[in-house]
């Protein structure tokens, strides 16, 4: 892929386009050993060697991060008042976003990327990608609950969830631990 050198360097997190142009004016940027002059030079991301301050800057089109989202962090790209999952990734170079959502008080594995096609293929209902959750509950779950979830639970008067799979892995008098596999992801469906 061919890009202008200013876009290439801005995409890789070296600074804004205006910052990059200042670096170029100072002679800090080289393409295949030759100093860039204008910021408009084209770079082939597959074969050209770009140096900034004599350090290589490799072009990475897509970024992928798996994070363990802690409780108290929201599944968003930005928020003025609350830390986000994107805030947790200091080394991200491009506009990354969470694939899916976990509630603020929920913790768990979350994919962060800038690969829109992958996100679409994982989230689009027509793609039928299951989502599996580990859940700890107050109260005892039993085989009746397993059957109810398998038939599709009525979440509220306007919505009945698609059939899902509930696997109880441990239960006591006042708690249960289980896995639930959903075929769709609706607001607070697991709660």
Predicted regions and their residues:
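Basic, flexible Lys/Arg- and Gly-enriched helix-loop patches that mediate nucleic-acid binding at interfaces
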Residues: 2-191
């Amino acid at each position: 892929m061919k890009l202008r050198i200013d876009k290439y360097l801005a995409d890789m997190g070296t600074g804004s386009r205006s910052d990059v142009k200042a670096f170029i004016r100072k002679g800090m940027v080289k393409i295949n050993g030759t100093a860039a002059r204008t910021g408009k030079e084209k770079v082939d991301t597959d074969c050209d060697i770009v140096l900034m301050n004599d350090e290589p800057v490799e072009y990475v089109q897509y970024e992928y991060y798996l994070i363990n989202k802690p409780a108290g962090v929201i599944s968003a790209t930005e928020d003025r008042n609350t830390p986000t999952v994107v805030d947790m990734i200091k080394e991200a170079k491009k506009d990354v976003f969470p694939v899916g959502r976990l509630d603020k008080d929920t913790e768990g594995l979350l994919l962060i990327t800038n690969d829109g096609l992958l996100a679409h293929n994982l989230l689009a209902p027509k793609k039928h990608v299951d989502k599996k959750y580990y859940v700890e509950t107050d109260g005892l779950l039993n085989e009746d609950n397993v059957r109810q979830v398998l038939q599709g639970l009525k979440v509220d008067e306007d919505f009945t969830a698609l059939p899902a799979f509930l696997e109880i892995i441990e239960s006591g008098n006042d708690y249960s631990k289980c896995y639930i596999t959903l075929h769709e992801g609706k607001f607070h469906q697991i709660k």
